[in-house]
């Protein structure tokens, strides 16, 4: 019984020490260049210079072409649910105009103004990403792990109580002398001595 308590104590100490070690580590330990996730190698800033630069004189542009419009259905996703469900659909029209010769700064300003106007109109539509719950790095801060540990502890505690009660019951029975099951030991006369003649070939 003492061994069981020692093992239980050692197990709890190992869990607590693992929890403190997990809290001490940070995300900077995972990268070689000792910088945060945002500054880690492999993540480069977005270069928008190539988007607006083009070659050609632009003499062959068709200025009389009509504006093309496309419609796109964007689902509204509730951010509170764990599973994405499409509630309503909104119709968003986007006009595509032929390319015009403007400076990149003017084009960027217009796009920025359009995106701000869209955000003011309907902020719920601005993100179509599926909402996912971020799991914490520490194992014991997750609710499912914590529930499993508590359930395991309760079951182990009940099993320990059962073993203690069984031990007490057997000790009381032993004191009463009820372990005599009625089997008699055979007497020494029941065993006959075999002849000790040895034959040599």
UniProtKB/Swiss-Prot annotation:
User: Which residues does this entry assign to the site Cleavage of ectodomain?
Assistant: 142-143
Give start-end of the signal peptide. 1-18
Q: How is it modified after translation?
A: O-glycosylated; contains both heparan sulfate and chondroitin sulfate.
The transmembrane segments are 145-169
What ranges does the record list as Polar residues composition bias? 90-102
Give any Pfam family that matches. Syndecan
Keywords, comma-separated and alphabetical: Differentiation, Glycoprotein, Heparan sulfate, Membrane, Neurogenesis, Phosphoprotein, Proteoglycan, Signal, Transmembrane, Transmembrane helix
Q: Where in the cell is it found?
A: Membrane
Topological domains on the Cytoplasmic side lie at: 170-201
- One annotated Gene Ontology cellular component of this protein: glutamatergic synapse
Topology relative to the membrane, per the entry?
Single-pass type I membrane protein
Record topology, Extracellular segments: 19-144
Positions of region (Disordered): 42-69, 88-129, 178-201
- Chief location of this protein? membrane
A Gene Ontology molecular-function term? PDZ domain binding
The keyword Glycoprotein is assigned to this record? yes
Q: Look up keyword Repeat and say if it applies.
A: no
The free-text function statement in the UniProt record for this protein reads:
Cell surface proteoglycan which regulates dendritic arbor morphogenesis.
Question: How does the record describe its quaternary structure?
Answer: Interacts (via cytoplasmic domain) with SARM1. Forms a complex with SDCBP and PDCD6IP.
This protein's name: Syndecan-2
Species of origin: Rattus norvegicus (Rat)
